[in-house]
Amino acid sequence: MAQYASYRWLKTRKNRLNTQCEVKDMDEIYETQPERTDLPLVVIPVIIESMIESFEKNFELFKDIARVRMYKDFTLDEDTIVARCVEADAIIVIGFHCADSILDRLNAKCYAFGGTGVASYIDLNKAKERGIRVCNVV
C-alpha cells in the first residue's frame, strides 16, 4: 500500500486542492483519487520541475472526472515512460517524443501535449489510424 507523505505536506496539498491525494513515493509520484478506480487514469510520466506546482494547482479540475498520476522527475528512457503509462487512458506529454515504438506498446486513447509543435513529437497519421486523440493541454 502506498505511503502517505508527512501530515503537514499532505494537509497543505489537501487544503490547496480540496481533494484527496496520495503520494506513493514522496519524491517521485503524486496521485489524486487513487481509490476511484472507476475513473479513467491520466498519467504525466515525466515533468519539468518548474511545472510541478502549476499542474498541482489544477488537479482539482479533474475531481470526479479522472484520476491523475504525475511522476515528479524527468527521463527520456522509453522503457521507463512506457512502464509508467501502461495503465493510462490518457497521457499528458511534456518534453519527450512519442516515438512509434511508444504508441505500439500503449493503449492510451488520448495524448495531450504541454507545448506547441505537436506534429514534431508524435506521428499524427499513426495516431489517427489507431483512433488516438492528440491535443494540447490548454
Q: What does each model-found stretch correspond to?
A:
Residues A2-A88:
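N-terminal glycine-/charge-rich "phosphate-binding" loop or analogous flexible N-terminal tail
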Residues E87-V138:
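Phosphate/diphosphate ligand-binding glycine-rich loop within oxidoreductases
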